[in-house]
A protein has these predicted regions:
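Sec-dependent N-terminal signal peptides
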Residues: 3-15
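Ser/Thr-rich, low-complexity intrinsically disordered terminal regions
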Residues: 18-137
């Protein structure tokens, strides 16, 4: 009996574990009152500025500079009932001929891999929102 309980716990933790290539974090919040406000506060806590696009179920941020590498990331939160789905994109700045960094022309999805700065920001927002996290592609 104990073995079955241990196997059940291990299997559930493996299902919700981060895998290389994951691009989304889905958070299920127990209490969905003021969930929009919670997500906004989580973004602001990590120095993101919210873009006001008048969409009641989606929050998007302006690009934010990474602290260690020359690049930017932009995050999006889609809110539906008590679920929040976080995704993001990043772009690396280019060094021009005069030694100045230029804004990225292309952005790519933030994916999970060891040492991903964008994923750390995405997960930081998810942890501030609270609730049960699940990771997917």
């Amino acid at each position: 009996m104990k073995l079955l309980v241990i196997l059940g716990v291990l299997c559930s933790s493996l299902v919700n574990a981060q895998n290389i290539g994951d691009t989304k974090i889905t958070i299920v919040v127990n209490d969905n009152t003021d969930i929009y406000k919670k997500v906004k506060i989580a973004f602001v806590d990590l120095d993101f500025i919210i873009k006001d696009n008048y969409n009641i179920d989606t929050l998007t941020t302006y690009p934010r500079e990474f602290s260690n590498i020359p690049g930017q990331c932009r995050l999006t939160a889609v809110i539906k009932d008590n679920k929040v789905t976080l995704t993001g994109i990043y772009g690396l700045k280019r060094l021009d001929d005069f030694g100045y960094f230029r804004s990225p022309k292309e952005y790519q999805n933030i994916i999970y891999y060891k040492g991903s700065k964008g994923w750390e920001l995405l997960k930081g927002v998810a942890e501030r929102i609270g609730g049960q996290m699940a990771f997917s592609k």
